[in-house]
């Protein structure tokens, strides 16, 4: 398997999903603006997403994929099918309980996670109503993530990567065509989330059948393999919960700020997630099963080469992305969101949060490579300890930054914390002699810095000659933005080529 081809496939699917996600956000911003209704929806949508990351894509994948890779490599197909059946049964049971409890306790959940909303009765009631509708998404998307983890282990990377597109399609359809039939209209977005969860699960099931892993969930509290996953999930849930608790605390802080703050941070986060998702999530998706297979087979040299390949690719693409995100923060927010009820002030506030987020983009992406280095070895405790340290320092930074920088201070805390997290993970990988960098890193980084400086000059020059970004229709703004972005990309890779960099070197990494 050529890792670069697999990464390109996953990244292209992820990019398509993110572009569609931007279209979704632009439509939502245009129809609903940034105010009480959108703040209520984003909180109601964020909470199921946080739990989904804890139970499904986060803790569950970290515990499940390395053991699944071991079963696939050593136990045979029949034993693997039984293992999948028992694990899916336990996951379904646990999440069904969480879903029902969350729906019943929605008002109390809001009191804890967004206490500032309690000061406005209408806002609090609307958020509770929306949360009851979106909570089943946890169960649906977690089962979809289980199916995706199995498909990834069988190297069917593009299928799970495409699935999130269906959520965006659902939300766009409901926003455009169903919202007028709901009272209030924002209820349409909540129902779109649940329908999107159903679509993502159903879409992947035929592909699971093709690889012979479509089995009925069964409950067995005594199966050795399933209990290993449960045992690993304990520290994994703690580790992932720490990072999600940090986001919840940020929401609590933001709920006390000016109306619209939650929405401004959400839109900035969506823009920041484009490069982190296209590269970071795609790399993590490919590296976890690949590293797990290398570890299970005892091939430490291949394991080390995979880590080095992933890190170099991170810096190759994340460094220019972070700089470009900061330089283009204004044109991005205006071109994508400043329409209808989304005002110039909303765009400016979103831009400030985006600049703050861009500081930590490299850290956010590098973590996606470094963390699987531990998870693939079934070592979850080390990242957990680092996550706890990061959480404490994040909240200290929140207290320091929220006064002078408001919502942008919360975004800056997340970015700086991501860089700290990545630094500590790297330090532990070196300290435990798990990873040794390959030769040539200094020359590699020097070329990147020079190329980024060239790219920055081109971007600033292009912005100088462009007319005001708020002028013209959305297609015209996006065409101008695309021209600037393409000029920056061309300048960056042209500079690398002049400096003797060969992209072909990355295509040689296979597993």
From Swiss-Prot:
Predominantly, its location class is membrane
How does the record classify its membrane topology?
Multi-pass membrane protein
- Cytoplasmic side residue ranges read 1-5, 70-82, 155-156, 208-223, 293-302, 375-379, 430-443, 500-511
Quote one Gene Ontology molecular function term. lipid-linked peptidoglycan transporter activity
According to its UniProt record, where is this protein located?
Cell inner membrane
**Chain segments annotated as transmembrane:** 6-32, 41-69, 83-109, 124-154, 157-178, 186-207, 224-253, 264-292, 303-337, 347-374, 380-402, 410-429, 444-463, 478-499
Short name of one Pfam family:
MurJ
Q: Which UniProt keywords apply?
A: Cell inner membrane, Cell membrane, Cell shape, Cell wall biogenesis/degradation, Membrane, Peptidoglycan synthesis, Transmembrane, Transmembrane helix, Transport
Gene Ontology annotations for the cellular component aspect, listed alphabetically:
division septum; plasma membrane
Q: How changing residue 18 to A/C affects the protein? A: Lack of activity
Periplasmic side of the membrane: what ranges?
A: 33-40, 110-123, 179-185, 254-263, 338-346, 403-409, 464-477
The annotated consequence of residue 52 to A reads: Decrease in activity
- What GO biological process, any one, is recorded here? regulation of cell shape
Q: Superkingdom of the source?
A: Bacteria
Q: What else is known?
A: FtsW (AC P0ABG4) is also proposed to act as a lipid II flippase. The identity of the lipid II flippase is controversial with conflicting in vivo and in vitro results.
Q: What does this protein do?
A: Involved in peptidoglycan biosynthesis. Transports lipid-linked peptidoglycan precursors from the inner to the outer leaflet of the cytoplasmic membrane.
Q: What is this protein called?
A: Lipid II flippase MurJ
Originating species: Escherichia coli (strain K12)
């Amino acid at each position: 398997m050529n890792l670069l081809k697999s990464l390109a496939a996953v990244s292209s699917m992820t990019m398509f999903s993110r572009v569609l996600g931007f279209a979704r956000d632009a439509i939502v911003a245009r129809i609903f603006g940034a105010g009480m209704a959108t703040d209520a929806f984003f909180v109601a949508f964020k909470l199921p997403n946080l739990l989904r990351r804890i139970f499904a894509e986060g803790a569950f994948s970290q515990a499940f994929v390395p053991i699944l890779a071991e079963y696939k490599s050593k136990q045979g197909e029949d034993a693997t099918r039984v293992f999948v059946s028992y694990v899916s049964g336990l996951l379904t049971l646990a999440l069904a309980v969480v879903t029902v409890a969350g729906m019943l306790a929605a008002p109390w959940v809001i009191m804890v996670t967004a206490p500032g909303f309690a000061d406005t009765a209408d806002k609090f009631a609307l958020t509770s109503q929306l949360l009851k509708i979106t909570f089943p998404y946890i169960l649906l998307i977690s089962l979809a993530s289980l199916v995706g983890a199995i498909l990834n282990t069988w190297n069917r990377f593009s299928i799970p990567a495409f699935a999130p597109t269906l959520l965006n399609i659902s939300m766009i359809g409901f926003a455009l065509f169903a919202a007028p039939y709901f009272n209030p209209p924002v209820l349409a977005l909540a129902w779109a989330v649940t329908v999107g969860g159903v679509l993502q699960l159903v879409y992947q099931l035929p592909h699971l059948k093709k690889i012979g892993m479509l089995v009925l969930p069964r409950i067995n509290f005594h199966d050795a393999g399933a209990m290993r996953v449960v045992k690993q999930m304990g520290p994994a849930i703690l580790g992932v919960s720490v990072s999600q608790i940090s986001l919840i605390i940020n929401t609590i802080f933001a709920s006390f700020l000016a109306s619209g703050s939650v929405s401004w941070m959400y839109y900035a986060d969506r823009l920041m997630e484009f490069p982190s998702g296209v590269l970071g999530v795609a790399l993590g998706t490919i590296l976890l099963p690949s590293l797990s297979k290398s570890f299970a087979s005892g091939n430490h040299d291949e394991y080390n080469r995979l880590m080095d390949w992933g890190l170099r690719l991170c810096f190759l693409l994340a460094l220019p992305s972070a700089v470009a995100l900061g330089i283009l923060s204004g044109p991005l927010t205006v071109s994508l969101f400043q329409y209808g009820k989304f005002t110039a002030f909303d765009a400016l506030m979103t831009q400030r949060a985006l600049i703050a987020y861009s500081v930590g983009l490299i850290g956010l992406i590098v973590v996606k490579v470094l963390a699987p280095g531990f998870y693939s070895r079934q070592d979850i405790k080390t990242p957990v300890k680092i996550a706890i340290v990061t959480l404490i320092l994040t909240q200290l930074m929140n207290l320091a930054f929220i006064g002078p920088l408001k919502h942008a201070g919360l975004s800056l805390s997340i970015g700086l914390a991501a860089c700290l997290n990545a630094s500590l993970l790297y330090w532990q990988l070196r300290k435990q002699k798990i990873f040794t960098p390959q030769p040539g890193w200094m020359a590699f980084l020097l070329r990147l810095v020079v190329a980024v400086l060239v790219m920055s000059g081109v971007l600033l020059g292009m912005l100088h000659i462009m007319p005001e970004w708020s002028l013209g229709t959305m297609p015209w703004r996006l065409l101008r933005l695309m021209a600037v972005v393409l000029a920056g990309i061309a300048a960056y890779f042209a500079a690398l080529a002049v400096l003797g960099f060969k992209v072909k070197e990355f295509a040689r990494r296979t597993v």
